[in-house]
């Protein structure tokens, strides 16, 4: 199969409450976006002004208020707060209600969302193995009438998902390193990563790992949706476009700086110490729509087929209208 080129909207659940965020998701469909994704956080990156609506009821509400857009998580962790069997049931239900429109995006998680509940936070190798096992359980529950599974970390006994969609809900794996990227190539229907990092990370590590996983599974890039979350900040005034990124400064922290942080107040303290130039380093910051198009196009040229745009500002309606009217038509014309 050939993967179509799609352009989506990242709904900032760490920045907006559920009702306002829902209106943005509906507007994204009206403005011509192809998909709406959100993360599933128990706590936001920033304490002051932060939000953290749960993704699961929100996706159901968004599906009911839209007709066309793909809806999904980017990403959800099915290994600590949730048992994988519960996630299998939830997304099977969503798949029945909104056939062909639902994506389950999963990742290994962050301490921010797990430790506060008294849950353990193991080292990266165990988190990776937990994710593999969770995906196995979810797929078996979706495929089988009666499932018993005894794994290292999870088990199910005589389990049945009674309401399953005719069309399987695709699983996308979010990854920022080669191991999880390779796993996406081997077993997933989609791969998610984020923009604004060293270009060599994509060309020398991540995409070769994806291709290696695909090759081991006898697949090609045409068999997997490659999704890039593209961080963008547009405003006619450059200083304003730059300052908009301040709320999302935690994205500029390294994995070593933030992975073990479980408190939004501490995360905010670390982020506030960053100069604005570093806070903005993950974003395409520009006052020129043509520059946005040129810099976004580089990710298409790398082979990504699904670009999901995340704007850091508080005026999401302005962003959605500007991107829908100015950027998406230019991108579609360029890659027609």
From Swiss-Prot:
HAMAP family linked: F420_G6P_DH
Positions annotated as active site in the UniProt record: 41 (proton donor), 110 (proton acceptor)
Name of the protein this chain belongs to: F420-dependent glucose-6-phosphate dehydrogenase
Main function: Catalyzes the coenzyme F420-dependent oxidation of glucose 6-phosphate (G6P) to 6-phosphogluconolactone.
One of the GO biological process terms: carbohydrate metabolic process
Catalyzed reactions: oxidized coenzyme F420-(gamma-L-Glu)(n) + D-glucose 6-phosphate + H(+) = 6-phospho-D-glucono-1,5-lactone + reduced coenzyme F420-(gamma-L-Glu)(n)
Organism: Microbacterium testaceum (strain StLB037)
SUPFAM superfamilies: Bacterial luciferase-like
């Amino acid at each position: 199969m050939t993967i179509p080129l799609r352009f989506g909207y990242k709904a900032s659940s760490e920045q907006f409450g559920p009702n306002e965020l829902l209106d943005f998701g509906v507007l994204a469909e009206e403005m011509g976006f192809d998909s709406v994704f959100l993360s599933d956080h128990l706590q936001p990156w920033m304490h002051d002004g932060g939000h953290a609506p749960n993704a699961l009821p929100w996706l159901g509400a968004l599906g009911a208020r839209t007709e066309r857009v793909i809806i999904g998580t980017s990403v959800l962790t099915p290994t600590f707060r949730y048992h994988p069997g519960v996630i299998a049931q939830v997304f099977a239900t969503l798949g029945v209600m909104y056939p062909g429109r639902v994506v389950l995006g999963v990742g290994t998680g962050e301490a921010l969302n797990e430790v506060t509940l008294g849950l353990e936070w193991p080292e990266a190798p165990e988190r990776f193995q937990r994710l593999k096992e969770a995906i196995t359980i979810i797929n078996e529950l979706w495929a089988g009438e009666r499932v018993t599974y005894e794994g290292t970390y999870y088990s199910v006994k005589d389990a049945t998902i009674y309401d399953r969609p005719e069309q399987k809900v695709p699983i996308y794996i979010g990854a920022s390193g080669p191991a999880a990227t390779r796993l996406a190539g081997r077993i997933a229907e989609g791969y998610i990563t984020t923009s604004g990092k060293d270009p060599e990370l994509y060309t020398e590590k991540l995409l070769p790992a994806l291709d290696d996983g695909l090759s081991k599974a006898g697949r090609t890039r045409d068999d997997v949706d490659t999704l890039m979350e593209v961080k963008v900040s547009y405003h006619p005034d450059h200083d304003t476009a730059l300052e908009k990124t301040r709320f999302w400064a935690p994205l500029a922290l390294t994995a070593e700086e933030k992975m073990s942080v479980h408190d939004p107040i501490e995360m905010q303290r670390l982020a506030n110490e960053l100069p604005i130039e570093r806070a903005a380093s993950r974003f395409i910051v520009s006052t020129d729509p043509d520059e946005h198009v040129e810099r976004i196009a580089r990710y298409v040229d790398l082979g990504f087929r699904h670009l999901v745009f995340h704007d850091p500002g508080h005026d999401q309606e302005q962003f959605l209208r500007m991107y829908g009217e100015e950027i998406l038509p230019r991108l579609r014309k360029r890659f027609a």
